[in-house]
Amino acid sequence: GEQDEGNVWEAAMLAGKYKLSNVIAITDRNNIQIDGPTESVMPLEDLKEKWEAFGWHVIEINGNDIEAVIDACGMAKAIAEKPIMIIAHTIPGKGVDFMESDFHWHGMPPDHEQAKKALHELRTLGGKIRGEHE
């Protein structure tokens, strides 16, 4: 929902105009905002084309993949002629069954029991991820 705001696009235009090559930004493109799915509230697609139109180099990644995030940051540092936007396509609440992709959790904290359950699920997921990368 942040990119519904004019100040985001004013900054995008300025950075593109002046070719601020020391700017690397990351958009968490999770497709939700506090009021619901972003495309229902205020459609943004094609987001990549919008940033490119303002003179930015755009890298799109799976933002739930930490290695992809690290790789994209490395690639971004190697680009010297313009600002960089990394669009990280994410699933909000990834790994927590009762939170995953549910916009209601975007602005609501879990209660104590929900937090315990979420942390347990994330710890279990973390062990699986570590095992895949060892």
Task: Describe the residue ranges of each PLM region.
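Glycine-rich ThDP/TPP pyrophosphate-binding loop and its adjacent helix/strand module
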Residues: 1-134
